[in-house]
Amino acid sequence: MEHLVDINDVESEEIEQLLDLAASMKENPGEFSGVMDNKSLVMLFAKPSTRTRLSFETGMTQLGGHGIFFEMGSSQLSRGEPISDVSQVMSRYEDAIMARLFEHDEMMELAENADVPVVNGLTDFLHPCQALTDMFTMQEKDRLDTLAFVGDGNNVAHSLMQASAKMGVDCRIATPEGMEPDEEIQDRVSDANVTVTNDPYEAVDGATAVYGDVFVSMGEEEQREEKLAEFDGFQIDQDLMDAARDDAIFMHCLPAHRGEEVTAEVADGPQSVIFDQAENRMHVQKAIVHTLVNQ
């Protein structure tokens, strides 16, 4: 595994090893406190973030390394410097690059020109760190069986489909008509137990984990009212949760908009694991960066 840009490029065995390492790092943090000593991770941001920056930066500190925040808007990138040049320069200074970008093509260009590992912190097409964290959280809660995602067939759904296919998870994606996942992703997982439906109750039936995401993604604010209308009937409320397995967990990549994609009763209820899930981002990402840098 040279980079983590796309889960499709990672073998199932490598994912299992990453999740095992993340579990060890979470359970015994002291054993890993110096494994990234004198190592640096540059964190390239084109999109605002809370969890991505905090989890990567704190994770590097816990491993004895250093995270460097780099905002594209205040750099020469905003004045037209090619991302391929920036990638090569960063490779001379840093031990790894994490990027949170809009365009997936830019992420691929970054990785293609880097001489150090590149980690995809998010693009509009994929969110691999989140999906691997979700597999870890389901495994930690003994719910790594059937995942129902209710929302937009976007980057999170794409990576969940791919991660589920790699891990043998029964994955159901419920979206309004016209918002289904990209056909390229559906083709990639066509041999796996991944289904797409326009009926949230069909998706949730018997699921061990029910997953929500925002109805209005970053950059879609002007379409807010239109998007909310299209998602009518897709809110995750207690009635929908009751259609899942009795011990199902509720997951969300955050930020959550209570009263839109999920009710407060569910988001803050006993089935919710959203803050365990948020914490686990840090541990899984520590495992990813450590593995890539020290392999």
UniProtKB/Swiss-Prot annotation:
Subunit structure: Homohexamer.
Keywords of this entry: Arginine metabolism, Cytoplasm, Plasmid, Transferase
Entry EC number(s): 2.1.3.3
GO molecular function: amino acid binding; ornithine carbamoyltransferase activity
Keyword Protein biosynthesis (UniProt): no
Other observations noted: Not stable below 1 M KCl.
Reactions catalysed: carbamoyl phosphate + L-ornithine = L-citrulline + phosphate + H(+)
InterPro entries reported for this sequence: Asp/Orn_carbamoyltranf_P-bd, Asp/Orn_carbamoylTrfase, Asp/Orn_carbamoylTrfase_sf, Asp_carbamoyltransf_Asp/Orn-bd, Orn/put_carbamltrans, OTCase_ArgI
Regulation of its activity: Arginine lead to a slight activation. Inhibited by all nucleotide phosphates.
Name recorded for this polypeptide: Ornithine carbamoyltransferase, catabolic
GO cellular component: cytoplasm
UniProt binding sites for carbamoyl phosphate: 49-52, 76, 100, 127-130, 253-254, 281
Gene3D superfamilies in the record: Aspartate/ornithine carbamoyltransferase
Physiological role: Reversibly catalyzes the transfer of the carbamoyl group from carbamoyl phosphate (CP) to the N(epsilon) atom of ornithine (ORN) to produce L-citrulline.
Family (UniProt): Belongs to the aspartate/ornithine carbamoyltransferase superfamily. OTCase family.
Organism: Halobacterium salinarum (strain ATCC 700922 / JCM 11081 / NRC-1)
pH dependence, record text: Optimum pH is 8.8. At the physiological pH of 7, activity is only about 30%.
Residue sites binding L-ornithine per the record: 155, 213, 217-218
Pathway linked to the protein: Amino-acid degradation; L-arginine degradation via ADI pathway; carbamoyl phosphate from L-arginine: step 2/2
SUPFAM superfamilies per the UniProt record, alphabetical: Aspartate/ornithine carbamoyltransferase (SSF53671)
Top-level taxon: Archaea
Record Pfam families: OTCace, OTCace_N
Subcellular localization: Cytoplasm
